[in-house]
């Protein structure tokens, strides 16, 4: 046997202030038939109808609602919604056509407290089950218990740590500091390696351009036999001649090898290798 629990009127918020959902009838039927033994007696003894006001909050995926947030009433009863309002019916048909979508309604706490038998649920979630619109009452008592436990644990933690020297870091702080220091060191190493690589690349590019320019001035085209041999000999010998500077460059102890020094070495070697 169905039992009428309440009639709800809902505002849709500022964006749709001109629309009010009326005559949202909340009904209950025990899942085991007409036997009310499993019901919360404070609810099953309702003799008067609760007239409540509520406001739309948001949409939600009903599959993501924790079981411990659902009122025990939800598990032992069929909780279903009826209406004679075409506006209300059209709203539910339109907004609940998506799979697993739920509509969260906040019941006005003052209105609930003033209603017959002090209707206890502040939040209701409406969803579509087949052709029916059903609802889930949300029970926040367990959440409040969790919140109180957390607050108590935080207070205990503060009492335990109070009086300790401020300069001492917690183990988590130490871990974070060590991690940050490690990241900082690694970043510096990477940046230093990049700088060294860029300096060496600049040296190679400068050396290559000087050799090619010197060979071109001497009228030796890259198609001529022996061009590659002279180029490689000059390149390798210049590197050897500046080996000490290159070592310092790799250790980042000097900024760069002066262009004039490289040019002078290349010119000397090209005169030697080309006899010009």
Curated annotation (Swiss-Prot):
Tell where it localizes: Nucleus; Cytoplasm, Cytoskeleton, Spindle pole
Name the principal localization, coarsely classed.
nucleus
Q: Keyword Cytoplasm on this protein?
A: yes
Q: Which InterPro entries does the UniProt record give?
A: Sld7_C, Sld7_N
Q: Name one GO biological process term.
A: DNA replication
Q: Which UniProt keywords apply?
A: Cell cycle, Cytoplasm, Cytoskeleton, DNA replication, Nucleus
Q: Which cellular component terms (GO) are annotated to the entry?
A: chromosome, centromeric region; cytoplasm; DNA replication preinitiation complex; spindle pole
Q: What does this protein do?
A: Required for the proper initiation of DNA replication. Required for mitochondrial morphology.
Family statement drawn from the similarity comment of this UniProt entry: Belongs to the SLD7 family.
Task: Report what the protein is called.
Answer: Mitochondrial morphogenesis protein SLD7
